[in-house]
Structure formats: C-alpha cells, structure tokens
Amino acid sequence: MYELACELFPICRSITGAGFRQSLKILDEAMGGGILKIHSIASGSKVFDWEVPAEWEINDAYIITPDGEKICDFKQNNLHVLNYSTGIDTELNLASLQEHLYSIEDMPDAIPYVTSYYKKRWGFCIKHEDRVKLKEGKYKVFIDAKHHENGVLNYADLLIPSTQKTKDEILISTYLCHPSMANNELSGPIVAVFLAKWLLGLKERKYNYRFVFIPETIGSIVYLSKHLKHLQKHTKAGFVLSCIGDDNAYSLIHTPSENTLADKVALHTLKEKNNFKEFSFLDRGSDERQYCSPLVNLPVVCVCRTRFGDYKEYHTSKDDLNFISEEGLQGGLKAMQEIIMNLEVNEIYQNTVFCEPNLGKRDLYIDHCKREGRVENILSFVAYCDDKNDVLDIASKLSIQAYELKDLIEKLKTNQLIKII
C-alpha cells in the first residue's frame, strides 16, 4: 500500500486535469487494469447549484529573486503554486509580490496548500521562514498555467455485485484531487483500492458495493446529479474515506441524525480501537457534506484515522510520506474490512423455540464450549433474538465484534433455532 502512495505522491493533482486522470489510471492498474469505469463531464455543465469549472493545466511555475535565485519552484514541490492559479509572466516589486504569497507564520518550515477553484487569481505558496528573508527589489514571476473552457472533469466508479439477489448497495466514496499530500489525499483512494480488491476476492457478498473516486466537493455534487434517485433508493450505508493512513487515531464523523446503519456499524467497529474519537456532523469536512445534505439525505458517515484538521500537518507540505506508514494504511484497511464484515453478518433474528433451546441434544453445547470457551455467548445471543435487536445490537451487549458471531449464527440457523425477520 505504501509503495502505491510513493508512486502517486509526486503527481500534481487538482479537481480537473491531467494529474487527476493519470492518478485514476494508476489506481486502476493497481486493481489489475480495466476495473474502474472512468467518466467525464464537460466544463460549464450545470450540476444542481454549481457549475463544473474550466479544466486546469499547469506546466511550470517559479519566482526569480533580485539576486537571481529561483524560489517557489513548482518542479521541486507542486504545493508552491496556488492550485488552479491563472498564468502570469511579469516583473514586480516585493510589496506587489507579497499580495500574492501565502505562508503560515506559526509553521514557518511548511509550505501551505491553498486553492482558488472558483476565483481567477495567481499566487505562490512559500515557507514563512523563506518569506521573511525576501529582499526589496524586482522579482520575476512565472506561472505556465491555462484554464480550458472546453475541458472536462473526470471521475471513476466501480460496482462490485452482490452474490445474492438484492439491489441494496454500500457506498464507498473517496477523493483524489489534492496534489502532493499523503494522508489527506492518498490514504483514502489507496485504502479504497485495496478494500475493493479484498471484496472482489470474497466468495459471498450480501450487498452490492459501489466505489466512487472523485474530486472533493464538486465531484460528489456531479456524481449525485447523475445518480441521485438510484442512490436514494438503494444505498443502505455509505462511508467517505479521508485521512486514513496515519498511526495516531481512529475517527468517525456521524450523519446529522446519528442513527443510520452507517453510524451504527462504524461506531460498533471503531469504538474500542486505540484513541477513538467521535464527531458530530457539525465537524463535517469532506464529501459527507454533500451526501448528507437535506434534499439528498443519504446514510453516509466519514471514517478517518486522524480527522482532517486535527493534525498540524494538514494542508501543508508536512503531510508527506513520513506522516503515513504501511502500518497506518493497513490499520485503515482493516477497520474498513471489519465494518464490511459486520455489515455482511448483520440481520434481525427471532427464536423458533419457547424458553432456552436444548443445546445438548443438538450437540451444540459441547461443540460451542470447545470452540468458544464459554457457552454463555450462544445462550445470550439466543436470549436477545427477539425480532427487534439486530446482530450489531447483540454483539455490542456481548462486547465483541458482530462478525465474530458468524459461525455461531450459522450453527443456530442450521439447527433451525433462529430465523431471519
């Protein structure tokens, strides 16, 4: 997983353009090739209250100081250029240049990430420690950038089919539009790719799984404009993957209601993990903003390791390949696999016999003791099969993950002691 991050990291991405397309192709190749369906929508297209912006092309950018030194070199770090900057080729004095520079005073050794998708302006991002050293004099500024009004916005999706006869879907959404930042950008798509590969390898799938790779905000708006009715009808739970590759925490941003299946299964799965943090929808920040908006109202939560904005490296050059790790990415993947396994096993069951079942005559008492060490789990599980509690409810009472009850449930079903409601 980390190797894929290293391959993607240097690419200059934005909400449109060649870098985004190149990154989609790399993700597709990581899945075996020909897996992702890549789509486009024309610049200028109306999508709800928004308009798809002109496609951005960036080739080079730098500043030449009065001493002849090249600084803010785009080819050294693509964060140096204001993302979606207009082109410029001119000379100006320091005071005029300062109006187009962005830095972080309390993080003097970091390059900030700044965008201007919907307002045409030019600019550079610079370490504050370098900014304060700038001398009076003439500066040459050069940005080789264009905005193509006849361009496109790209996105990709993948539908992994259920092995059962159902149209119910689980949505996995992630974004791919940030340039060289590791946790905020690459961790979500990488975890999504490996999650999809894992799902494709399962022999049985209760749900259909819809994976969406988009530019943040405008991409989810575009996707909803194309698929809103279908998603509203068939989505049972959804998960936005963001900032899911570090080692420091596990985080959940709830839906507005906090009572959907997505809220329930994510909380059940993550709450016992180290340094778990739970947030309300007031702390939203990624594409859950669109999926959970009032007229859309999809059951979608956001799953992170350390939540966006809660680590000082966020939206700076410090969010680099040292901030994520193979272990962090694997932890994010495992968390999502557990969420899926808990969803897959979840049903509402009802007992088929009065009082406690006789486990001994069905050889369940001995078998279960050997396998689980305690007979209490099987009796407690049956005790809560009241056609109201689902498996997630019962597993929470037993302080175990729902998927750990899978074999027990199969035994009870085989012996016709429970039935699905």
Language-model segments: residues:
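N-terminal hydrophobic/helix-forming segments and targeting peptides
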Residues: M1-I421
